[in-house]
Amino acid sequence: MYAWPASEVPALPGRGRDLRIHDTATGGPLTLDPGPVARIYVCGITPYDATHMGHAATYNAFDLVQRVWLDTKRQVHYVQNVTDIDDPLLERAVANGDDWTALAERETTLFREDMTALRMLPPRHYIGAVEAIPGIVPLVERLRDAGAAYELEGDIYFSVESDPSFGGVSGLDAEAMRLLSAERGGDPDRPGKKNPLDPMLWLAARPGEPSWDGGSLGRGRPGWHIECVAIALDHLGMGFDVQGGGSDLAFPHHEMGASHAQVLTGERPFAKAYVHAGMVALDGEKMSKSKGNLVFVSALRRDGVDPAAIRLALLAHHYREDWEWTDGVLQEAQERLARWRAAVSRPDGPPADALLDEIRTALANDLDAPSALAAVDRWASAQASEGGTDEGAPGLVSRAVDALLGVAL
């Protein structure tokens, strides 16, 4: 599977600061020191109802991670998956009278277009779950053969008790895990499971559903968590720098994935930091495909909204914050974009070296984009009220906003 084209990242003078970011597993800040090549895995979409504002907010957060790393003169090895086979996708295809493969391809194409418009830097590897199946099957077989997985009516389950550190990512107690498992794709009430929390590794073929050759597992398709594990291990290996996604992925998805990988390899951690973006609401409820309360990037673009304004609307909220999308949020972003563009269109202005430092400092501090935006606002206000004589300032501001915030002025 291919990703989307990369937008150019302008060069900036000097070097950015190392990123200090909130780690879900420890519950506190962690200063990342990735070495010359930073490694990040971000869980991708299930390709139906793409791209809603919750998606966009999540990928915006991890785009900032990439930009901060690039500003420290590091290379970034970014991997993202596409969950192009899953129960919700199949259910939507049936409900729409659509072919599931056509639905997945159409929505993935739309997602790429939205990411391009929003100037999200693409992953180096963009991998669909279906194309990863040949690498998934041997991992499930290894877990089964090691006694870390078991069969139940043809399905293969992972035993969470095989990982002594299970629970270390989310920090939840067993009852909270059970409730979230039921809400988020698990089957804690299925009779015969060794532990209600045990997740599916391999779903045996069902009549009328797609299936693939699973070797000694029989025909079927993979469970959700093992898909990301297989892709991450193949392209990044153990101990990569950041595992990212929305906060609703901390459990069960990232918890289970960490256990799968750690039992498979005998090493830990799977990722050095688990980083989660907040949820975006509409009319007081979390934006979700199941509820249908969605605002789509593509719909806003069709209505003539500048993608740069959409991105500024996302940046106005700290990535870990839960917030609500409103018309007012978008209007404020559009007005900010107009002020910034007017400010950088002038031939000179107030010196901007300090502004570049402020943006870098804000983003290095747990991706504090709102503080970065406030710094640019102050420069733009000074430009509007007093002006300046630094001929290089408008260009530096424009390049800094593009390189570090992903907004083209």
Swiss-Prot record:
Sequence motif 'HIGH' region, location on chain: 45-55
Example of a GO MF term: ATP binding
EC number: 6.3.1.13
Principal EC category: ligase
Keyword annotations from UniProtKB, A to Z: ATP-binding, Ligase, Metal-binding, Nucleotide-binding, Zinc
Motif extent ('KMSKS' region): 286-290
Chain sites annotated for binding Zn(2+): C43, C228, H253
Pfam families: tRNA-synt_1e (PF01406)
Note on cofactor: Binds 1 zinc ion per subunit.
GO biological process, one term: mycothiol biosynthetic process
Placement of sequence motif 'ERGGDP' region: 183-188
Listed cofactors: Zn(2+)
The organism's place on the tree of life at top rank: Bacteria
Subunit structure: Monomer.
Family of this protein: Belongs to the class-I aminoacyl-tRNA synthetase family. MshC subfamily.
Function: Catalyzes the ATP-dependent condensation of GlcN-Ins and L-cysteine to form L-Cys-GlcN-Ins.
Xref: PANTHER family: CYSTEINE--TRNA LIGASE, CYTOPLASMIC, CYSTEINYL-TRNA SYNTHETASE
Designated name of the protein: L-cysteine:1D-myo-inositol 2-amino-2-deoxy-alpha-D-glucopyranoside ligase
Gene from which this protein is expressed: mshC
